[in-house]
Amino acid sequence: MNTVTELLQPVENDLDDLILELKNLIGAGHPILQAAAEHLFSAGGKRLRPGIVLLISKAISPEFGLTTKHKRLAEITEMIHTASLVHDDVVDEASTRRGVDTVHSRFNTRVAVLAGDFLFAQASWHLANLDNVNVVKLLSRVIMDLAEGEIKQNLNRFDSAQSFSKYINKSYCKTASLIANSCKAAGVLSGINDENLTSLYDFGKKYWFSIPSRR
């Protein structure tokens, strides 16, 4: 049993349910988008991001356990992450991810761009339905950060003089922002105080910078 599996064991069943629910949520009635979504969520991966959100949610709400809104937040987190990967693969012209054909390789670039857009739109829709403006602000900031991080990466791709602080800022936008703000959003949904919300944000940010592979 590896470390990630051990870490996520308390929410293993919840993660299985999450993947099934994601496939249902993405099924938009359009056969190509539905096929792309099925392909995306059948490609494996650690599901570490939604797993961390679920673990945090359980830890800060031991009396009530996971609520429907906490579970939906975890689903939104994975939708945003997956949408960003689809777009990244197009920009990077990657043919495979985790040993599986990327969406634009299996279908085409147009379908991949639209599939990524559709996932972002779905995430935004379900985010709005949480009926919590502070959570909406946190996750909307993430989507802005993802776009900003990708732009920074491509503008500085061949800049060997790039400062370490610029590199860290780019990496925060592309990776750490999502889990940091999702952890904080879990706390917002649980109604915890501002000091603990800051601690959740800091935990997500520092944890994500501390692990060797964040893709």
Features from the language model and the residues they span:
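N-terminal amphipathic/basic leader segments beginning at the initiator methionine
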Residues: 1-24
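Mg2+-dependent prenyl diphosphate-binding active-site environment of isoprenoid biosynthetic enzymes
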Residues: 16, 23-214
